[in-house]
Amino acid sequence: NQDIKVWNISLGSMEEVPRNSISPEAALLDKLQQKYDVLFVVAGTNQENGEPTYLGSPADSINALVVNAVNRNNKPASYTRRGPVLSFHHKPDLAYYGGESNDPIIACCGTGAYPAVGTSFAAPLIARKAAYLIYKMHLSCELAKALLIDAACAWTTPEDMDRLGYGIVPVKIEQILETSNDEIRFMLSGVATERDNYNFNIPIPVSGASYPSVARATLCYFPKCNRNQGVDYTDTELDLHFGRIGNDGRIKSLLPNNQGEEDCTTDEEKARKKLRKWDNVKHIAEPLTSRSKPKKVYANPMWGIM
């Protein structure tokens, strides 16, 4: 049913996924998401008695929103399994409350309230939030995924990404949709075609001769994939540059990035490790600390996204 945009999958294999290849089940989910414009929210799978350690299929789906569990103290649940998948892709994407055996969450079943524990119960709560963003706020699947990741990460540096992904999603939907009084959010969505560049200029408030602000950006997209290519599984790469526009017309990205420029000296290893090349989720941000300083304004006061 193509009218259903969000599908929850609260099941998974007890076996670990291979380190350098995608599972058949995850590859099928990736194909369906890219082809039919749907979003699968997948439980991060559970471990029993400390094993296995790594995620089980289909939680290695690249396009899916993979959810691990935390306890009420915002720490990884005792049964949480870990990423990455395909050697370097960040999975899980997010974490949410899944309870512990001595402190379960309450789920609803056919006979009423039921004390529950597991990533299988955390994932549906995120699926509900994703469905609200898509059906009620009319966001695309990719934009809904990006917004959830951005809300989880916020201005913090992700910790323990192998088990918590980009962070814990806020409980209230208002915390995902709304910004504080000192924040501005821009959301861009569209369809990219092969070998094209897309440039956007964004007006950022200026105070005197500087920008008294910090910034962050989150990019999500659903690429075509090929399971026969091993760790080179994704066929599509979208590069992200976001920052001030210098006097030379180039974007001074928050994360220095000269890919695509004539003087590019970035090798493949660095591009993957530092710039997340071939990863379909990219998050770049400036740290928000007491030492954050205003930034110089160039001749063009706009910021650029490319």
Segments from the language model and where they lie:
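Subtilisin-like serine protease catalytic core
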Residues: 1, 35-37, 61-63, 85-91, ...
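Substrate-binding/access-modulating region of protease and related hydrolase catalytic domains
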Residues: 1-57, 115-117, 121-122
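Generic beta-strand/beta-sheet core signal
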Residues: 10, 41-43, 67, 97, ...
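Extracellular S/T/G-rich loop segment that most often corresponds to the catalytic His/Ser-adjacent loop
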Residues: 53-131
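C-terminal subdomain of the subtilisin-like protease fold in secreted/lumenal serine endopeptidases
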Residues: 135-212
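Noncatalytic modules at the cell exterior or secretory-pathway interfaces
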Residues: 212-215, 273, 282-306
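Extended low-complexity, serine/threonine- and proline-enriched intrinsically disordered segments
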Residues: 214-278
